[in-house]
Structure formats: C-alpha cells, structure tokens
C-alpha cells in the first residue's frame, strides 16, 4: 500500500488526528497530552510507537532492566497486545502496535490508532514503574554507592513528571 493511499485514509478519520506520512513512510503527531506518536509504514503493516524511556548509561549499568520489563510486560492482555521493543543503539524502550495493511480501511485504521492511543500511556506509566523498581531493587541488594542511588532517585523523579 502506498503512502498516498495511506494519507487518503487519514483524511477520512473522524475521531483521531494523525499527521500525514512523509516520503520516508514516517508520521509524527503530537498528541493532546504532549506525547509524540510515531507511525511507520512497513511492507505488511502500519506500526505505531511511543517512547517509554531512554535508559542511557543506565542500560549498561543495569542490564537486568529490559529483562525485568519483558517479565512484567503483560503482553496480550490488559494493554491490548501492545508490545515493547528495546533499541540497543539509542537505549530507548518503545511501546509498539501494528495494524496489518491487508484490506486496510479508514475505519479499521482509525480504530487501531484509537486503541494504541488509549492504551499506550497507561502501559508506559506501568513500564516506568517497572524501570524504577528495577533500579531501586538492584541498589538495595548490591549495595551500590550512595551517589548512584541519588542518580536513580533523580531518574525516579524524572519518570514521575
């Protein structure tokens, strides 16, 4: 399915606003709550994604964080089959959702976008608590120096914003 056709489907949306896809197949939309919603057209689907957290140096210092996220991800249930993806290069954890482009209609596309928007933020909030818990639990067990604990407290404060 080509970008022009996908953009024409977007114009038929009644309840959700998404920006048009650019020539590279990517759309970026700032939602009412301030979050950025990204969408990407692939050969088989339109993938929606939102950033959960950039782990930065903490990714190397706490390799258990992503496995903790996977163990707590609750895939397939409460959050309507959203999934998490970790980009090791940028150390960003993403929440993703795919809509098959086979027989894609404006209604089906809009319903998928609504489902993602409705479920992504509660899922992101949940995952951020897992990240924070992972950092704090590891510190209490391993006796990490207080300066690192303070740094993780800053991360907790940042995640609470």
Predicted ranges, named:
Residues 12-13, 68-72, 76, 112-126:
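Conserved short hydrophobic interaction patches
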Residues 37-58:
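Short, well-structured hydrophobic secondary-structure segments
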Residues 53-92, 96:
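Short, internal acidic amphipathic alpha-helical interface segments
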Residues 26-27, 46, 91-93:
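Hydrophobic residues embedded in beta-strands of well-ordered beta-sheets
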Residues 90-114, 118, 125-136:
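Well-ordered alpha/beta subsegment
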Residues 128-161:
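Short, highly charged C-terminal tails/helix-capping segments
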């Amino acid at each position: 399915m080509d970008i022009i056709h996908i953009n024409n489907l977007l114009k038929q949306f009644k309840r959700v606003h998404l920006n048009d896809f650019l020539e590279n197949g990517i759309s970026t939309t700032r939602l009412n709550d301030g979050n950025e919603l990204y969408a990407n057209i692939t050969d088989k689907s339109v993938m929606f994604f939102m950033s959960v957290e950039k782990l930065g140096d903490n990714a190397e210092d706490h390799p258990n964080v992503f496995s903790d996220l996977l163990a707590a991800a609750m895939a397939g249930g409460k959050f309507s089959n959203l999934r998490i993806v970790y980009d090791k290069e940028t150390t960003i954890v993403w929440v993703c959702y795919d809509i098959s482009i086979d027989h894609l209609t404006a209604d089906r596309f809009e319903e998928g976008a609504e489902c993602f928007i409705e479920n992504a933020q509660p899922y992101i909030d949940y995952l951020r608590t897992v990240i924070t818990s992972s950092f704090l639990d590891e510190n209490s067990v391993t006796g990490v120096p207080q300066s690192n604990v303070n740094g993780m407290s800053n991360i907790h404060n940042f995640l609470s914003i």
